[in-house]
UniProtKB/Swiss-Prot annotation:
It comes from the Bacteria. The gene is pdxY. Its EC number is 2.7.1.35. It catalyses: pyridoxal + ATP = pyridoxal 5'-phosphate + ADP + H(+). One of its GO terms (biological process) is pyridoxal 5'-phosphate salvage. InterPro entries: PM/HMP-P_kinase-1, PyrdxlKinase, Pyridoxal_kinase_PdxY, Ribokinase-like. It is an enzyme of class 2 (transferase). Gene3D superfamilies: 3.40.1190.20. Substrate binds at residues 9, 44-45, 221. Belongs to the pyridoxine kinase family. PdxY subfamily. This is Pyridoxal kinase PdxY. PANTHER family: PYRIDOXAL KINASE (PTHR10534:SF2). CDD domains: pyridoxal_pyridoxamine_kinase.
Length: 287
């Protein structure tokens, strides 16, 4: 069984960070080692929350503990998401290096959580670290549209510009870029776009965009997690991408149908493993 060290936020109530990632990966047959960067009562979009960030030294100590019992060689991938402090970002790099020293075949998937144009933000210093340093150590990066713009330092309005931006980012280190949400000025307003780019291919896919009054939090976290799991399970890039699109759609649709704000991950678990609705991806740049 594949093992993922998932370094993300934790909420006591609801689904965000590891709370949106652990269950989908496990439901797909991947073992998860959750390492929480923060412990909050709930996600921050409620406007009020309690809790705090975990000290970076404690994160390092926990991973050192795993190494001390000889388990780090079993780690097949590291997935990082929301970081609470710049020191945690540096700790993630040290953790990735430790994992790769123990298992040279391990992959690092970086979800560079910086927030959205209109939504949440991260603490000062984290965005700069993610932009400056993380591409150099990442095997795969999973930004949303606004995060991709920050990573390359310019606005992106079309699919072609997004593909070019991903390829530019890949020159700094990543072998693949998954754009979890792509805003394309030429797309229909009721479509949610995703894009995945490698050195040899680029695939685009769409699912319905559900008109929530308040968009659920954790969709991006779940998207990265499903893609990590399907990749580790041996899917091709296209297959992992399409399964991710379909599984996430199933959860979001169940959330919409239930009239909920928090993701209906448990209710939609069978569709995470075996989605009923499938969305075919298409080549947008054969490279």
């Amino acid at each position: 069984m594949k093992n993922v060290l998932s370094i993300q936020s934790h909420v006591v109530f609801g689904h965000a960070g590891n709370g949106a990632s652990e269950f989908p990966m496990r439901r797909l047959g991947v073992n998860v080692w959750p390492l929480n960067t923060v412990q909050f009562s709930n996600h921050t979009q409620y406007g009020h929350w309690e809790g705090s960030a975990i000290d970076a030294s404690q994160m390092l100590a926990l991973v050192e503990g795993i190494g001390a019992i000889g388990m780090l060689p079993r780690c097949d991938a590291v997935l990082s998401g929301y970081l609470g402090t710049p020191e945690q970002a540096q700790a993630v790099i040290e953790i990735v290096r430790a994992v790769k020293a123990a298992n040279p075949h391990a992959l690092y998937f970086c979800d560079p959580v910086m927030g959205t144009a209109t939504g949440y933000r991260v603490e000062p210093g984290i965005q700069e670290f993610l932009v400056r340093t993380m591409p150099e150590v990442s095997d795969v990066m999973c930004p949303n549209h606004s995060e991709l713009q920050r990573l390359v330092g310019r606005e992106i309005e079309t699919v072609e510009e997004a593909v070019a931006a991903c390829r530019e980012l890949m020159k700094r280190g990543p072998k693949m870029v998954l754009v979890k949400h792509l805003l394309d000025r030429n797309s229909l307003a009721d479509r949610f776009n995703m894009l995945v780019v490698t050195g040899r291919e680029a695939w685009m896919g769409q699912r319905p965009l559900y008109p929530f009054a308040r968009q659920p939090v954790g969709v991006g976290d779940m998207t990265s997690a499903v893609f990590v799991a399907r990749t580790l399970l041996g899917d091709s890039v296209r297959s992992a991408f399409e399964h991710t699109l379909a599984a996430v759609n199933a959860v979001v649709r169940a959330t919409w149908d239930a009239g909920r704000y928090e993701l209906e991950i448990v209710a939609a678990q069978d569709d995470i493993a075996r989605p009923r609705d499938w969305f075919d991806a298409w080549v947008v740049d054969p490279a």
